């Protein structure tokens, strides 16, 4: 029996039963309930009709003598008639959750007794006769008006029958239908059934014996209190009960209406969805439609539902699989933070894992939400062995994965080894201060998380084997898997061989219903491969619409490339101000625009609720995300918003799939294949979130993690590097320039370091630690990024002189001084150049050029200019670019500049100007704005004035030059201030790059064996 009905029919009173129970009573915890009237003065002698809060499976089969006999018709009618005429006595039983007297019990029999003539049995819901006499006709008309037609009445009747069958499984449908026909409400039908059949559960149950005569007297007092209740209160409670019944009928009608649209899901599932949306039909319908389209679970159309009867359909998924996926889908919404009205989490994502298709039936698939902290829990022998083996052999890194196990505790566990048996383990763990038995039970969590990852690995391995088998089979048959360049592409342009392999790989994963990550190294033409794939889909009849989400700096390049390579595709640019986007949305909704592809930016896609709503409602076929590493954080708001885009398939394009750790890679996989990974995100987060270490410091476990990650990503990612596919591409040479700081700069850096070192012990927040690191980085780059030369005395003088300026004549000098205090030396220098009265406070050129990196950079630029090379110069800081402009002007070098403040419309013109005007020597770029999707192959030297904490941002910058179309050898120069924090940053970056190498290196196969790499197989199949 479901909990909804279980809680509605619970009774509060207890009293004595004339016969002792044959079985010991078992207490049950009270739950919330709604009021219903059903009592009599002699109820204690008759036995209480009660329900235990247990599932149906726990209720024993009902015996013949376990029911309370129905009173004679004449007595029952006389009682009700008396109540209708006088309406002076009405008894209500309080079923509130505060009652502590309710204690349903199981028993074998209930003694049969006849109701006395004085007994009055009153239910809160009126019978049909009572309704016809006492209730106004308007009420009946309102009740009937809630059901729109006869089919809805029949469906409601079916719902009532189903509910009664759950409560009274031993009764026939005909008996239950008679009760439904004889009453007008659900509560009335159940109350009548309780009177006629007795215990609803179908199992022999008895009232619990009162422990003392005081309990009986208390019940009698409660009865008297109830009998004396004022008529107004009784009517109010009766109205509340009727209203509750009416609400239930409304809700059931909504459930039935929703089930017509989604015949695959049972009513209980739909009820829970409606609860999620506050019983709002339209919102629940929209949510389920989005889910159904995403899952290919079809909903019933108008033609498929006739006369309220569901028509059977062929489904792509089984009913159980659809339920599980719906649970996973809905359980994700509160995590994404969109369902703000939600009060409680109906679905448990952990339980979804337990019920998923990966469940092997072993203990490894059980829910992780169980409580393992109880030392009295009986552990299975299999888990005992696993836990013992884990604690015996695990490394410190593995032990720290145990909940509440710190590094120190892990070290203590290692010192306690060996653990020969289970008893020894408990004894040793209990004796050591700081350790407890809880750590032993918590090991089960780690083991289960490993099992989840192993199941994912096995699933991914099966997918990979299927792809490999198909390509191998096609190759063996001589047909091969070779999709030629689509005819829609510009015939004057041709795909390179490795790009054809990429196109074939995209077509292969699409055929198998998978999503993928095209992770070719920067500069190999991922944009062109994606456009070719859209052209292939167009030829196959899939004309969209598709969505391409790109960084703002590359939107012009994408529009240009699509128009160049495949002019047949109609492209709609969703970009501009809020008003412009509003007009575009209006055109889309009213179908004024004819388009196959929508191109937009990450910001425009999710910046407002209207933007997000558009892409939730649009039925997109493919959503392509350029620079997909922007989705590396599954906890970010951007990630959560983009997950709501309603696209049947997803494709990520990224040149750097692995950046800081394996968790970022798993975030990308979860984004493209949410139905496979979303139910396991917590396990994935814990297993792959640890920091990387150098190869010589990696434990066996850390190497296993890398192997596991490689196994999981194998079917979904295609990664080629330039050295593999571009034999003719000129080489790239890396050069590290250690720059000695100037004498003054070294003094300032040392003083800053000592000051920060003294205060670092008081810092607790990571944000403050990051600020310390940033201050050191700025000083290592240039002293003018701090305020050193403009002392407080100078600033006071300058603030007074500023009053002579026409724009500041009425200003407050104290406020001017406060503003100047937070400015850097270079900002104050620019301010002095701007205002005449403080012009004399400008810094000398020697101070501006007083930097160790500037001295080295000046020499390098002079040499490169003599050779005829052209330079792309990157910096993390826009203010550093300002100072670099002074340097370039001082040495009379022509340059262009592009940073985050440059308008999107101007960027493409600056790039074209640099690529066509060979007299421009230097292109100044900020690493973030100029490191994505820009082609600068006309330059052959890349200088990184200051490196990024993320080496892949630097790699993106490097590959602006080292890409397809480059004809010269590319030189990459990194400027590192010697003896500063930048040396440590360089070392950490090298470790991160090693992780990518470990992940992308293909394991060497045995000699003569078939290569397992899909790309290699495709290449062989295509004869390349």
UniProtKB/Swiss-Prot annotation:
Sequence positions bearing N-acetylmethionine: 1
GO biological processes: chromatin remodeling; chromosome separation; DNA double-strand break processing; positive regulation of transcription by RNA polymerase II; regulation of DNA recombination
Modified positions (Phosphothreonine) in chain numbering: 54
User: Where Phosphotyrosine occurs along the chain?
Assistant: 216
- What are the Helicase C-terminal domain coordinates in residue numbering? 856-1008
Q: Does the keyword Transferase apply?
A: no
Q: What is its main location?
A: nucleus
List, for all copies, the residue spans of the domain called Helicase ATP-binding.
507-675
What protein name is recorded for this chain?
Answer: SWI/SNF-related matrix-associated actin-dependent regulator of chromatin subfamily A containing DEAD/H box 1
Q: Identify the coding gene.
A: Smarcad1
């Amino acid at each position: 029996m479901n909990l909804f009905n279980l809680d509605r029919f619970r009774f509060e009173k207890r009293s004595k039963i004339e016969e002792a129970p044959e079985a010991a009573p078992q207490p049950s915890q009270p739950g919330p309930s709604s009021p219903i009237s059903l009592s009599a003065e002699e109820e204690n002698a008759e036995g209480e009709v009660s329900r235990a809060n247990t599932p149906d499976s726990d209720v024993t089969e009902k015996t013949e003598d376990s029911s309370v006999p129905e009173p004679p018709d004449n007595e029952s009618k006389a009682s009700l008639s008396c109540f209708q005429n006088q309406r002076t006595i009405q008894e209500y039983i309080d079923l509130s959750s505060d009652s502590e007297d309710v204690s349903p019990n199981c028993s074998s029999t209930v003694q049969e007794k006849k109701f006395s003539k004085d007994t009055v049995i009153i239910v809160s819901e009126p019978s049909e006769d009572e309704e016809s006499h006492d209730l106004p006709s308007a009420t009946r008309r309102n009740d009937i008006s809630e059901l729109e037609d006869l089919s809805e009445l029949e469906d409601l009747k079916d719902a009532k029958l189903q509910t009664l069958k759950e409560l009274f499984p031993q009764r026939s449908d005909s008996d239950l239908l008679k009760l439904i026909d004889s009453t007008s409400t659900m509560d009335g039908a159940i109350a009548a059934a309780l009177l006629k059949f007795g215990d609803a559960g179908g199992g022999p149950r008895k009232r619990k014996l009162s422990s003392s005569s005081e309990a009986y007297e208390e019940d009698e007092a409660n009865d008297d209190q109830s009998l004396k209740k004022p008529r107004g209160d009784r009517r109010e409670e009766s109205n509340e009960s009727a209203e509750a019944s009416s609400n239930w009928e409304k809700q059931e009608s909504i459930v039935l209406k929703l089930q017509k649209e989604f015949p695959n899901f049972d009513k209980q599932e739909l009820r829970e969805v409606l609860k999620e949306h506050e019983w709002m039909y339209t919102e629940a319908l929209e949510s389920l439609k989005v889910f159904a389209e995403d899952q290919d679970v079809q909903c019933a159309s108008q033609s498929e539902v006739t006369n309220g009867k569901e028509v059977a359909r062929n489904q792509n998924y089984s009913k159980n699989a659809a339920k599980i996926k719906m649970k996973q889908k809905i359980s994700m919404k509160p995590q994404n933070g969109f369902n703000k009205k939600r009060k409680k989490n109906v679905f448990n994502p952990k339980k979804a894992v337990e019920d998923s298709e990966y469940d092997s039936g072993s203990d490894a698939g059980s829910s992780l939400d169980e409580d393992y902290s109880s030392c009295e829990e009986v552990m299975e022998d299999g888990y005992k062995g696993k836990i013992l083996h884990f604690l015996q052999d695990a490394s410190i890194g593995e032990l720290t994965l145990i909940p509440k196990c710190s590094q120190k505790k892990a070290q203590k566990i290692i010192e306690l080894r060996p653990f020969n048996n289970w008893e020894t383990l408990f004894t040793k763990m209990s004796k050591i201060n700081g350790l407890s038995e809880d750590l032993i039970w918590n090991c089960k969590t780690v083991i289960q998380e490993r099992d989840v990852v192993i199941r994912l690995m096995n699933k991914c391995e099966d997918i990979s084997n299927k792809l490999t088998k198909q390509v191998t089979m096609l190759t063996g048959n001589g047909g091969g898997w070779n999709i030629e360049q689509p005819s829609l592409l510009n015939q004057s342009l041709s795909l390179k061989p490795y790009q054809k392999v990429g196109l074939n790989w995209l077509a292969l994963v699409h055929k198998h219903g998978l999503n993928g990550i095209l992770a070719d190294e920067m500069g190999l033409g991922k944009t062109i491969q994606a456009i070719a794939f859209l052209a292939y889909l167009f030829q196959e009849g899939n004309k969209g619409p598709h969505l391409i989400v790109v960084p703002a700096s590359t939107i012009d390049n994408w529009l240009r490339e699509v128009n160049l390579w495949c002019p047949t595709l109609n492209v709609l640019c969703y970009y501009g101000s809020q008003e412009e986007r509003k007009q575009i949305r209006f055109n889309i909704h009213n179908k004024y625009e004819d388009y196959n592809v929508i191109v937009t930016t990450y910001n425009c896609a999710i910046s407002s609720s209207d933007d997000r709503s558009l892409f939730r409602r649009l039925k997109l076929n493919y959503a392509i995300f350029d620079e997909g590493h922007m989705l590396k954080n599954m906890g970010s708001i951007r990630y959560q918003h983009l997950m709501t885009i309603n696209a049947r398939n997803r494709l990520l394009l990224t040149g750097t799939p692995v950046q800081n750790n394996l968790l970022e890679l798993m975030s990308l996989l979860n984004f493209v294949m949410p139905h496979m990974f979303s139910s396991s995100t917590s396990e994935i987060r814990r297993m792959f979130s640890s920091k990387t270490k150098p190869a010589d410091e990696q434990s066996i476990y850390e190497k296993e993690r890398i192997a596991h990650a490689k196994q999981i990503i194998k079917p979904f990612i295609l990664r080629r590097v330039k050295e593999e596919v571009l034999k003719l591409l000129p080489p790239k040479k890396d050069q590290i320039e250690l720059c000695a700081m100037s004498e003054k700069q070294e003094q300032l850096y040392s003083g800053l370091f000592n000051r920060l070192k003294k205060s670092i012990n008081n810092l607790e927040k990571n944000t403050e630690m990051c600020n310390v690191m940033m201050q050191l980085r700025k000083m290592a780059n240039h002293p003018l990024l701090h305020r050193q030369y403009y002392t407080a005395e100078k600033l006071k003088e300058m603030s007074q002189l500023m009053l002579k300026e026409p724009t500041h004549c009425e200003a407050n000098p104290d406020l001017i001084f406060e503003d100047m205090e937070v400015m850097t030396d270079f900002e104050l220098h620019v301010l002095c150049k701007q205002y005449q009265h403080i012009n004399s406070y400008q810094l000398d050129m020697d101070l501006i050029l007083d930097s160790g990196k500037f001295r080295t950079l000046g020499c390098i630029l002079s040499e490169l200019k003599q050779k005829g090379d052209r330079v792309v110069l990157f910096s993390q800081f826009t203010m550093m670019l300002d100072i670099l402009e002074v340097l370039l002007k001082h040495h009379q070098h022509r340059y262009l500049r592009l940073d985050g403040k440059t308008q999107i419309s101007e960027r493409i013109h600056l790039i074209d100007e640099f690529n066509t005007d060979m007299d421009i020597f230097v292109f100044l770029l900020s690493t973030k704005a100029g490191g994505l999707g820009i082609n600068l192959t006309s330059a052959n030297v890349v200088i990184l004035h200051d490196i990024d904490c993320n080496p892949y941002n630097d790699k993106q910058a490097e590959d602006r030059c080292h890409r397809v179309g480059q004809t010269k050898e590319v030189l990459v120069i990194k400027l590192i201030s010697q003896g500063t924090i930048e040396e440590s940053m360089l070392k950490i970056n090298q470790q991160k790059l090693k992780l990518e190498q470990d992940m992308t290196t293909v394991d060497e196969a045995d000699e003569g064996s078939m290569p397992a790499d899909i790309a290699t197989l495709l290449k062989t199949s295509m004869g390349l």
